[in-house]
C-alpha cells in the first residue's frame, strides 16, 4: 500500500470458512519464524476469487494483524485534523465485523517519520487474555480482549524514523526497544502493571539516512 493510500484494507484469504488451524499471536507467528502448521492453503486468488470478506478502514498502518480464536486484533493510525488518532481494533475473522475500535493515544500534530513508515507499524502481541500494543514513543498499552484498557505507559524520546519494533512477551515481561535520536535502550515492563522492571542502554545510534 502506498503512503498516499487513505484507507487500511484488511483481506482475509481462507480456503475454509468454518475455522482456523491455529492462533497467530505475534509478528511472524507463534514462534516468530513466519511458519504456520496449516495445510491446503489457497495458492491462487483474485479480486473476487477465494475472498471471504474485505474490509476498508480509515488510516494507515504497517502493523500485521494477530489472530486469537476467530478474532483479529490490529492497530491503526487515523489522521484527525492536524493530529493522528492511534487506535486498536478487534475484528471478527469470520464476518469482518468490527467488534470495537478504541483510541489509545493521540498525537496533536503528526511527528516526522520516515516516508516509508507509518505511525502504527509495530505488530500487537496477543498473550492469553491480554493484548499488548506499542506505538513507539507515543505509548504502549495493555488491553483485555473485550477492549478494556488495563494500563498505558509512555516513554518520551525523540524518534528518528518512527517506530518499527514489535513487542514480545517473555514470562512476566513485555520487551521492546526504544531506538531514538538519543539514549537508545531496551525496555522490560511488568506485563501486568506496565511498571518498568529494567532498562538496558543500547550502543546503537539510529542513522539519519538510509
Model regions and ranges:
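Bacterial N-terminal signal peptides
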Residues: 8-18
Amino acid at each position: 500500500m502506498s503512503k498516499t493510500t487513505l484507507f487500511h484494507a484488511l483481506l482475509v484469504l481462507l480456503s475454509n470458512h468454518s475455522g482456523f488451524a491455529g492462533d497467530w499471536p505475534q509478528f511472524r507467528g507463534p514462534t516468530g519464524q513466519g511458519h504456520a502448521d496449516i495445510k491446503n492453503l489457497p495458492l491462487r486468488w483474485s479480486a473476487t476469487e477465494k475472498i471471504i470478506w474485505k474490509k476498508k478502514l480509515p488510516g494507515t498502518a504497517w502493523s500485521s494483524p494477530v489472530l486469537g480464536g476467530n478474532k483479529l486484533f490490529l492497530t491503526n493510525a487515523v489522521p484527525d485534523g492536524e493530529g493522528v488518532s492511534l487506535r486498536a481494533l478487534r475484528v471478527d475473522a469470520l464476518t469482518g465485523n468490527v467488534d470495537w475500535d478504541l483510541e489509545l493515544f493521540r498525537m496533536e500534530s503528526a511527528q516526522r517519520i520516515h516516508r516509508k513508515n507509518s505511525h502504527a507499524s509495530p505488530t500487537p502481541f496477543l498473550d492469553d487474555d491480554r493484548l499488548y500494543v506499542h506505538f513507539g514513543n507515543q505509548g504502549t498499552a495493555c488491553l483485555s480482549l473485550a477492549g478494556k484498557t488495563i494500563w498505558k505507559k509512555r516513554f518520551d524520546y525523540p524518534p528518528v524514523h518512527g517506530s518499527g519494533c514489535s513487542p514480545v512477551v517473555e514470562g512476566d515481561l513485555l520487551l521492546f526497544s526504544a531506538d531514538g535520536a538519543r539514549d537508545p535502550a531496551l525496555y522490560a515492563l511488568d506485563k501486568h502493571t506496565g511498571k518498568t522492571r529494567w532498562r538496558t542502554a543500547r550502543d546503537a545510534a539510529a542513522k539519519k539516512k538510509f
